[in-house]
Amino acid sequence: MLDVGFGELFCFGIIALLVLGPDKLPVAARFAGRWYARIKRYISNIQNEIDRELNLSEFRKEMQDELDRLHTLEQTMQARLKEIEKASTEKIAEQPKQPIESEPSITPQKYIFCITPQTIVPFCHQKQHYQQPERYNDLVLESSSVELKIAV
């Protein structure tokens, strides 16, 4: 990284020994080693962040490519759908117009509920052969039309 050879490192050590002396040289070497480790760690972190950003940018590019592909696919599907709609309207227009046969009118069926002492019985069309208790006399029996609708 710094292109320092063994000879240059040896010269640097001798100069440091002469300037600092044997007492302060170990403390200075420890201090320089800590700073070297910190700088190396910072450089490593920066390289990792750059690698992550590059991977993230590659991922973003891949995602954008996929979105573009999906957009193109959606456009082709829309075009095909329009072609199908156009063909179906043309086919309907080509068919001769026939009068629509009216369906027989369906009258809603009326449900009549008869009250027996035990249960309420639907579709009871026969008269009851029993005497209703007093508590059922106040109850008004009504018939109503019921339409069934199915939601799809």
Curated annotation (Swiss-Prot):
GO molecular-function terms, A-Z: protein transmembrane transporter activity
Gene Ontology CC terms, in alphabetical order: TAT protein transport complex
Family: Belongs to the TatB family.
Keywords: Cell inner membrane, Cell membrane, Membrane, Protein transport, Translocation, Transmembrane, Transmembrane helix, Transport
Task of the protein: Part of the twin-arginine translocation (Tat) system that transports large folded proteins containing a characteristic twin-arginine motif in their signal peptide across membranes. Together with TatC, TatB is part of a receptor directly interacting with Tat signal peptides. TatB may form an oligomeric binding site that transiently accommodates folded Tat precursor proteins before their translocation.
Name by which UniProt lists this protein: Sec-independent protein translocase protein TatB
A Pfam family recorded for this sequence: TatA_B_E
Organism: Acinetobacter baylyi (strain ATCC 33305 / BD413 / ADP1)
Example of a GO biological process term: protein transport by the Tat complex
Transmembrane domains' residue ranges: 1-21
Protein location: Cell inner membrane
